[in-house]
């Protein structure tokens, strides 16, 4: 009986409503002397790390910085530290292994996770387990998490549902829904931009890294997701 109740509680928790960012919004509205530094952490691979055309890193033309600018425009009283714990070439499996040491140790107020591009060559079950491990660890410390679907890749067949990039995007959407965490569906916006007639070469700096225009698309998608979750003026 106890095992059935445990399973039921897991299922109920899994289908919880997405996290509400109203408390974080209130924190960002707090003025001196009652305010404090707010830690915003971006975890993932080379894209949030700021790589454009490898090995060049353009921190100020990459979505973590662009989101930082948008946050400061909306919350002029807030002290906001944007920290990138991303590592170029990494996938979610080693990313999960270092999550507590490199991410939770920073005492973040919100965490963004972006690994789909590099997860394509990893086994499905290990990828899902890694994402779930990071989400669970964040939930245990009551930190809101935002999952990111990928930016594009010129080698991917974006119109093929069975393309590995589409499959990874679908997995992330499923995990976000099941776990009741936030999602910024960058991949959906990216594909919509392509469908409007924009060549991928105009939003990529190389085969798998966005340029400023591509990072701007990602940042706008992320910020919209935050606003919809309660991050409002």
PLM-predicted stretches and their roles:
Residues 19-85, 98-107, 198:
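Serine-esterase "nucleophile elbow" of acetyl-processing enzymes
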Residues 39-41, 72, 78-106, 118-148:
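Internal alpha/beta domain cores that form substrate/cofactor-binding pockets in large enzymes
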Residues 1-4:
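Positively charged n-region of N-terminal signal peptides that target proteins for export
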Residues 151-233:
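Catalytic His-Asp segment of secreted/periplasmic serine-dependent ester chemistry enzymes
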Residues 47, 55, 84-90, 112-121, ...:
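Cell-envelope and extracellular/periplasmic
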Residues 25, 64, 68, 96, ...:
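Extracytoplasmic/secreted envelope proteins and their assembly/folding machinery
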Residues 10-18:
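Hydrophobic h-region of N-terminal signal peptides that target proteins for export
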Residues 114-118, 134-169:
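Active-site segments of SGNH/GDSL-like serine hydrolases
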């Amino acid at each position: 009986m106890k095992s059935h109740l445990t399973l039921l509680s897991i299922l109920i928790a899994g289908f919880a409503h997405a996290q509400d960012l109203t408390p974080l919004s209130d924190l960002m509205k707090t003025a001196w002397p009652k305010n404090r530094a707010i830690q915003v952490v971006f975890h993932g691979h080379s894209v949030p790390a700021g790589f454009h055309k490898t090995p060049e890193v353009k921190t100020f033309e990459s979505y973590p910085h662009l989101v930082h600018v948008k946050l400061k425009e909306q919350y002029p009283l807030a002290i906001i530290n944007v920290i990138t714990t991303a590592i170029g070439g990494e996938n979610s499996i080693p990313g999960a292994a270092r999550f507590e040491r490199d991410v939770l140790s920073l005492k973040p107020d919100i965490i963004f996770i972006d690994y789909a591009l590099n997860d394509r060559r990893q086994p499905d079950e290990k990828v899902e387990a890694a994402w779930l491990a990071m989400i669970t660890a964040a939930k245990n410390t009551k930190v809101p998490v935002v999952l990111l679907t990928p930016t594009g890749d010129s080698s991917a067949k974006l119109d093929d549902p069975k393309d590995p990039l589409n499959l990874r995007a679908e997995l992330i959407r499923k995990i976000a829904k099941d776990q009741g965490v936030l999602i910024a569906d960058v991949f959906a916006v990216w594909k919509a931009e392509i469908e409007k007639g924009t060549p991928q070469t105009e939003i990529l700096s190389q085969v798998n890294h966005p340029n400023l225009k591509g990072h701007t698309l990602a940042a706008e998608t992320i910020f919209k997701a935050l606003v919809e979750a309660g991050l409002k003026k």
